Amino acid sequence: MAKALITYASMSGNTEDIAFIIKDTLQEYELDIDCVEINDMDASCLTSYDYVLIGTYTWGDGDLPYEAEDFFEEVKQIQLNGLKTACFGSGDYSYPKFCEAVNLFNVMLQEAGAAVYQETLKIELAPETDEDVESCRAFARGFLAWADYMNKEKIHVS
């Protein structure tokens, strides 16, 4: 069984809500999933997973949240060798750099050698509408299809 990690930073609970919608969707495909807050995550464990999804909110004018800074710096030091990854997060359009921390993680993962799903998921505040929830679910399914999981395991994503 393929192993996936979803790790996230969430101050208001919005990014955590997104993480759990993604987790619930991925569980439909019988993945072994760990869902862990980012400040409880040891970056050296990333390479023990087949898939890693990182979620974050953006602090202030485009900064990483405090609780994600150490993890971010630790991951930069690891060679990820094609590890399949994706980034998601929540933000507020009233700030000039909407969900910029998601972009920062996306670029850093590429620089660390990960294979990065280029379709990031960015939700305004909380995933409260049916459309937001479906966007989260579609992101999870799209990531799996991109990662070629379906072909390996003969599972059809619907």
Curated annotation (Swiss-Prot):
Residues 4-144 form the Flavodoxin-like domain. InterPro entries: Flav_short, Flavdoxin-like, Flavodoxin, Flavodoxin/NO_synth, Flavoprotein-like_sf. Its cofactor is FMN. GO terms for molecular function: FMN binding; oxidoreductase activity, acting on NAD(P)H. The keyword Electron transport applies. Keywords: Electron transport, Flavoprotein, FMN, Transport. PANTHER family: FLAVODOXIN 1 (PTHR42809:SF1), FLAVODOXIN 2 (PTHR42809). Low-potential electron donor to a number of redox enzymes. Belongs to the flavodoxin family. This is Probable flavodoxin 1. It comes from Bacillus subtilis (strain 168).
